[in-house]
A protein has these predicted regions:
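Conserved nucleotide-binding/hydrolysis micro-motifs of P-loop NTPases
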Residues: 18-19, 25-29, 47-49, 62-65, ...
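Post-DEXD/H (motif II) to motif III coupling segment of the RecA-like Helicase ATP-binding lobe
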Residues: 1-47
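Conserved SF2 helicase motif VI
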Residues: 121, 158-169
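Loop/turn-to-beta-strand initiation segments
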Residues: 15-20, 79-80, 104, 127-131
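Conserved helicase ATPase core of P-loop NTP-dependent helicases/translocases
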Residues: 91-97, 102-139
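Conserved interdomain hinge at the start of the Helicase C-terminal
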Residues: 8, 51-100
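A short beta-strand element within the Helicase C-terminal
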Residues: 131, 140-155
Length: 169
């Protein structure tokens, strides 16, 4: 998504002898905009054999999905949680359902203006809302260590998205 911008930056820093790139995910190949003579992966982080993540699976019929999500979120008793949906419309539907049932949550997706997204994150971080309902936009770049729960209301469409979503905890 940022190939043009990264190509420009790469050209501007051609004079540098060493370039260090950091990524949250491992890639098989370097992006096209990079032209390293001798690329190397240094100090690659490997996940521990015993990560501090517990996965739970709750099979639910589609017609009961909203109700079960509501029950699950209530069981978290105020701990910060993120609920991931695949589409903006789904985030709005989930948030509306929860609000209609007395549960306050806030949405975060790419269809919002930048200032709206920033306000949503501020309200989530400061505890005004304990649940953030978001698209995969929220799976990257959010660093909120207090997040205790990640819920996949809609299962991600790729393994990479699954990894990034769960990385929020």
């Amino acid at each position: 998504g940022f190939d043009d911008q990264m190509s420009y930056i790469n050209e501007e820093f051609r004079c540098l002898e060493k370039v260090t790139l950091v990524s949250a995910t491992e890639h098989k190949e370097f992006p096209n905009y990079l032209s390293f003579d001798q690329p190397a992966v240094i100090n690659q982080l490997h996940l521990s054999e015993d990560p501090d993540i517990t996965f739970w699976k709750f099979p639910v019929r589609n017609q009961n999905k909203f109700e079960r999500l509501f029950d699950l979120l209530c069981s978290f008793r105020g701990e910060l949680s993120i609920v991931f949906c695949n589409f903006r419309e789904a985030t709005e539907s989930v948030c509306t359902y929860l609000a209609e049932n007395g549960y306050d949550a806030i949405v975060y997706h790419g269809g919002m203006e930048q200032d709206e997204r920033e306000r949503a994150l501020i309200k989530f971080r400061n505890g005004s809302f304990h649940t953030l309902i978001c698209t995969d936009l929220g799976s990257r770049g959010l660093d909120i260590p207090e997040i205790q729960h990640v819920v996949h209301f809609q299962f991600p469409q790729s393994e990479e998205a699954f990894i990034h979503r769960n990385g929020r905890t």
